[in-house]
Structures are given as structure tokens and as C-alpha cells.
């Protein structure tokens, strides 16, 4: 409970994801610190339209607004030395070249404890320990399962 857990709520989550977050916080008694974009999802959509097509300057701006800026704010507020994340080496080509310990943005050491696990091993771990799971997660900054949202590529 003493360790702050940062969650960037980009505002485009599914109802199942919001329920999942509530379950996880309650189940694990987390000290969740929620960071949201300065512009809500409804505001963004009203001003800019729907989520932009991938690999466009508009999508890059979208990612900065809804994911990268709130993350930067959280990192500036907490100034952590260590950034724990849940990436795995088998998620995409970019991540295959990373390691369990890497240097990250904001002068952090990124630690990926599940880096060498497969998706099946993670699912077994979750199931064996009766942990809440969310199969309905969608990250609009990635758009597709094997893309990056931008956080891991920043140094």
C-alpha cells in the first residue's frame, strides 16, 4: 500500500477495463495514482474527431495528448528511480531487443519482471492465483496488439 502505482487512464477504456481496475485495486490493496489527459476523451473527440489512423502525424499527436503527457506528469510528480512494467519479449519485434533491466526515460531503471514469460505462462500464473484478469483491454495509442504506444521507445 505504501508504493504508488501509476495508471494512465487515457479515457478510451472499455467498461470491462474500468471494472477490472477497480477489482485489482481492491484485491491487491493498491495505492493507485490515476493520471488522465488534460483533455477528456469526449473533449478530444469533439475537437479532433475519432481516434486517428495509425502511423499518421495526427495519431502521434493523439498519443502525446492521451498517454505520453499524463505519463510524463506522473513521472515528474513522483520522480521514481525504478519503473516496473509488464512488458514481455514476445509481444513485438521492438521488445525482443530489450532486457529485464533497461534504462528508461525520466532517469529511471525500467524493470520488466515478466519479460521472459510467455502469454500462456502469464495466464496460468493469473489463473493459479485467482487474480483478476481483463481480456477486453484496448490501448488506442497502440491500435494493434504488436505495436508500441511510445512509452518503451523513449529514452
Stretches with model-predicted labels:
Residues 1-155:
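Nucleotide-activated chemistry modules centered on ATP-dependent adenylation/adenylyltransferase
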Amino acid at each position: 500500500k505504501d508504493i504508488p502505482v501509476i495508471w494512465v487512464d487515457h479515457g478510451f477504456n472499455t467498461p470491462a477495463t474500468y471494472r477490472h481496475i477497480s477489482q485489482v485495486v481492491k484485491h491487491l490493496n493498491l495505492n493507485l495514482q490515476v493520471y488522465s489527459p488534460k483533455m477528456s476523451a469526449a473533449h478530444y473527440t469533439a475537437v479532433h474527431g475519432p481516434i486517428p489512423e495509425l502511423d499518421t502525424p495526427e495519431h502521434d499527436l493523439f498519443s502525446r495528448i492521451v498517454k505520453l503527457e499524463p505519463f510524463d506528469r506522473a513521472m515528474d510528480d513522483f520522480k521514481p528511480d525504478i519503473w516496473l512494467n509488464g512488458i514481455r519479449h514476445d509481444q513485438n519485434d521492438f521488445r525482443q531487443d530489450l532486457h529485464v533491466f533497461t534504462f528508461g526515460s525520466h532517469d529511471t531503471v525500467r524493470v520488466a519482471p515478466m519479460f521472459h514469460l510467455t502469454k500462456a505462462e502469464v495466464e496460468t500464473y493469473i489463473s493459479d492465483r485467482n487474480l483478476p484478469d481483463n481480456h477486453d483491454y484496448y490501448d488506442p495509442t497502440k491500435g494493434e496488439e504488436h505495436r508500441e504506444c511510445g512509452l518503451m521507445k523513449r529514452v
